[in-house]
Regions:
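Sequence termini and other peripheral, non-core segments
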Residues: 1-76, 80-196
């Protein structure tokens, strides 16, 4: 669970997602938004997993949404708490989700199934979401790459922890990913005073 906040602009941020994240994060952002709808607008009930463990679930009164949205997941994860705390947060993730769907089509020449299933329904904000100003998403990453600036931190996270698999099909490698020789050289790419 994460929100790869690689740029303040959700469209540019989506373009900066590496190939693996373009595929994966479309689903994850849809999961975050689905969870926001269920937790904010749904009715809580107890269910059982396949292993007969108790689990909290939320049922939506709108049968169309109930039957299409993903189940609530990781409700206490900082990214989930953040997205459902503000309409501006939800809107940012939705805009990045749509941009990622476009990015997926650009890179792979086809439409992601999650786009077909959820793009239209997720454009609607949860009914009970608060209207507040935007704050940067939480930095869900190891402490050694965190900084006081969330965009810088997520770019550091990519440089240090995602460099071994990160590639960009039909896109130029982002400037912040160029000339990286290893994890030990992180200080070359950032001002050490930015560490939190």
């Amino acid at each position: 669970m994460n929100i790869f906040y690689l740029d303040n602009d959700p469209i540019k941020s989506a373009e900066l997602h590496c190939d693996k994240h373009v595929v994966k994060m479309i689903i994850e952002y849809a999961q975050l938004m689905s969870t926001a709808h269920r937790v904010l607008d749904g009715e809580l009930y107890e269910d059982r997993t396949a292993n007969n463990r108790r689990i909290k679930r939320w049922r939506l009164s709108d049968s169309n949404m109930e039957n299409v949205l993903y189940k609530a997941s990781h409700i206490n994860h900082p990214s989930n708490i953040w997205i459902r705390s503000s309409d501006s947060h939800y809107q940012f993730v939705y805009d990045m989700f749509v941009a990622l769907c476009n990015e997926y089509t650009h890179r792979y020449g086809r439409v992601h199934l999650t786009e077909e299933k959820l793009k239209d329904i997720l454009q609607h904000l949860p009914n009970n979401i608060a209207s507040t100003d935007f704050v940067d998403p939480p930095q869900a990453m190891p402490d050694d790459v965190k900084t006081s600036d969330a965009v810088d931190a997520y770019q550091n996270y990519y440089r240090v922890y995602k460099k071994d698999f990160a590639k960009w099909t039909d896109r130029e490698t982002p400037a912040f990913m160029k000339n990286i020789s290893g994890k030990d050289n992180l200080s070359k790419y950032m001002d050490e005073e930015l560490y939190v």
